[in-house]
Amino acid sequence: MAEITVGQLAQQTNKEVDALLKQLKSFGIEKSSEKDTLTPTEMKTLLEKINSAKNTATRKKVTSVKLDGKHKINVSVKRKRRVAKKMEQQESTTLEQPQELETMVQEVSQQVDIVKEQDNIEQIVENKEAVKVQEQRQAEIAKPVIKDSGFKITAMPEIKIEEIVAEDDEGLAASDKQAKKKAAKKVFSEAVNTNTKYKREEEEKKSKAKKAGGKGFKKANPRQLSQLAGDLESFDEFGAKKGKLKAPKVKKQEFTKPVENTVRTVEIYEGITVSELAQKMAVKGAEIVKVLFNMGVMATINQSLDQDTAILIVEEMGHKYTLHNENALEEAVTIVDRSSYKKISRAPVVTIMGHVDHGKTSLLDYIRQTRVVAGEAGGITQHIGAYSVKTDKGSITFLDTPGHEAFTSMRARGAKSTDIVILVVAADDGVMPQTEEAIQHAKAARVPIVVAVNKIDKPEADSDKVISELAQRNVIPESWGGDVMFVNVSAKTGEGVADLLEAVLLQSEVLELEAFAEGLAEGVVIESRLEKGRGPVATVLVQNGNLKQGDNILCGTEYGRVRAMHNDLGKKIKAAGPATPVEILGLSGVPAAGDEMVVIENEKKAKELAAQRSQKQKEAKIAQEQSLKLSNMFNNMGKEGEQQVLKIILKGDVQGSVEAIRESLLKLSTDEVKVDIIASGIGAITSSDVTLAVASTAVVIGFNVRADSAAKKLAETDGVEFRYYNIIYDLIDDVKKAMSGLLSPEMKEQIIGIAEVREVYRSSKFGSIAGCMVIEGVVKRTNPIRVLRNNVVIYEGTLESLKRFKDDASEVKKGLECGIGVKNYNDVREGDQIEVFEVIEVAKEL
């Protein structure tokens, strides 16, 4: 017998190496690893031990076979091997054992394949004939027999099939083999019949479900079979039910696959809110608020952000950005291609500026030969007038601006839309504050100046004084080597007016003013108002192109179709060229003075662009209010008391006047009293204005307008007072007085008398009594006092007693002696002064 290793023996006997080593050790054969060899003597000893102990080795193998539907079967194969041989046949049996085991495994695998072909087995079948054969074989001891107790098949639900298949062996008789084959055939024929019956029942159930309108049976998801395996089987090993079937449990996924961060491209536009930015980046708004907080900005999810802040947030969170061009629509609509048109020379647009009452409108009146000043309240121009004047040498368009300081913005607007500025300075007054402002506006707009020294006909006129004062402000005349023309004029007599017009036309020739006379018109809104029966009326100065009746126009946030046009004389016209002032009707609302006017071919685009501009204005207003709230929060820290507010509802005749008054009133606000214009508009005072005034306790002010009948009745019922004004001086002065009335009175101390201590007496009742002489004013018994020593206050209190000789006195006048007892103070010395004062209320003024 050749030597064999432990590993080879374990492989032949289908045993684990460790288990075989333990078994060898129990038999007294010491081996430590699978590479150790077994000698023939050790092999003989091993076989003797096995035969003497009649050792039995049992192995079990479980396999799973899937069936259709929701079921599967478990096939359990058990092998028992008992060796009972005669001593002389042990060696040969041991050598043949691996071959017998291999044959047995092949037979079992064939049987398992047959079982896998069966879809379902629901009952236990026992092979009685195989058991009888087994008993016969156990009785035969003479021949070595390796018995296989067979395999057991466990199906779901808990259906078991046990069958015993005997292994082929050289010592088995032919009758035993035939009996074994018959038993195996019988077992599997019964299994096939059972499976066929089960399939027939399943088909009947499916057909019934289809007839009943049901969906029938669904094929089970392979992923669900493992979940259902433990829940569907509720039978014991004898086939009895243990309980009701449980519903399949939904198992939670224990591991979430990590997702790679997505880098998004965010489109950022001006005024984007925190919530919109969060939505574009697919994050929560709270995360962006945290980022802003870390950047030192306190914000809410509805707050608007500027583009720079939004860019920082997007970069901080690891995304990319693109800037949204908000002006794309505006550029596409408003930019007009005029390359195919020719330019022509146009009339100059001249703005007359100067101080109030220096004769601007009178000069223009003389030029136009009309009495415009007679129609102005108080002789003061309240809003811009646009006029076109034809002279022998050409046409000139004049813009007359107010001279009052309240109309600074209107003067600036006139300077922006003008070519030449005529600066009117009175020869008797010289340079005044509004004159300096007019110079600043003209220089800021880089507009050439022509100085008209007016009122030259007066005896006190001094033109040299005017020239020297203007030279100090860098307005150098040509006679001094500068570039500014000075013309002495008189609006009353007409002296020098022709020379002034000639100087203006000469300056316009130097400028070479040109414009396009064809194409879509462009211009600027000079003034706007709301007229009863006509609607919104806008005074427009055409700068380029040809404005025609019926054109679709866009003025700021208002749009419409030109229904009618009137020139400066009130006549209807069909078209207007460059440098022509016209009044137009047909806008959707009253535009703001200074807005650009453009003609757009498509009315739909004009409406869309107007809505976009309106939205921009709202967002800008909200952003400004937010910044003001933040600044006010820090400015009001530590301030005591509440700020008084004077609420005003302002109505005017024209847009420019309302705007100027609004700015002037807002400038009156102080830390203690604030002017709040809660509503302003153009046109008559209506009942809605009265209702708003009642709700907000506001004052209603009308400038060159009156209340309608419905508003008057409602005002009488609710007790609302209207204040009408025609001159802006009176309006501002009255508002100042009203604001002063809201101021809390100021408390001031006033010294009413001083008494000098000449001698000190002692009294058992009052303590120290000062004998005094009143040297100033009067000393009163009830007023507070201060004790001064060397002009330093050492005590402040009240008088306990005041006597003249032995009698009590309520007051002692200057030059008289008296006795004064100071309450709770006895350290009065000779030479001290007792100062008597009183606290009075003084009304504050702005």
From Swiss-Prot:
> What GO molecular function terms would the record report?
GTP binding; GTPase activity; translation initiation factor activity
> What are the start and end residues of every segment in region (G4)?
454-457
Segments of this protein annotated with the region G5? 490-492
What GO CC terms are in its UniProt record? cytosol
CDD domains for the chain: IF2_eIF5B (cd01887), IF2_mtIF2_II (cd03702), mtIF2_IVc (cd03692)
Basic residues bias spans? 207-219
Stretches for region G1: 354-361
Main localization is cytoplasm
> Where is it localised?
Cytoplasm
Q: Where is this region: G2?
A: 379-383
Q: Where is this region: G3?
A: 400-403
Keyword annotations from UniProtKB, A to Z: Cytoplasm, GTP-binding, Initiation factor, Nucleotide-binding, Protein biosynthesis
Boundaries of each tr-type G domain copy?
345-512
The residues the record assigns to binding GTP are 354-361, 400-404, 454-457
Q: Which InterPro entries match?
A: DNA-bd_dom_put_sf, EF-G-like_DII, IF2_II, IF2_N, P-loop_NTPase, Small_GTP-bd, T_Tr_GTP-bd_dom, TF_IF2_bacterial-like
| SUPFAM superfamilies (UniProt xref) | Initiation factor IF2/eIF5b, domain 3, P-loop containing nucleoside triphosphate hydrolases, Putative DNA-binding domain, Translation proteins
Which stretches does the entry tag as region Disordered? 199-219
Domain of life, per lineage:
Bacteria
Q: Which PANTHER family match?
A: TR-TYPE G DOMAIN-CONTAINING PROTEIN (PTHR43381:SF5), TRANSLATION INITIATION FACTOR IF-2-RELATED (PTHR43381)
NCBIfam families named in the record: IF-2, small_GTP
Q: Which family does it belong to?
A: Belongs to the TRAFAC class translation factor GTPase superfamily. Classic translation factor GTPase family. IF-2 subfamily.
Purpose: One of the essential components for the initiation of protein synthesis. Protects formylmethionyl-tRNA from spontaneous hydrolysis and promotes its binding to the 30S ribosomal subunits. Also involved in the hydrolysis of GTP during the formation of the 70S ribosomal complex.
What is the name attached to this protein's record? Translation initiation factor IF-2
Which species is this record about? Francisella tularensis subsp. holarctica (strain LVS)
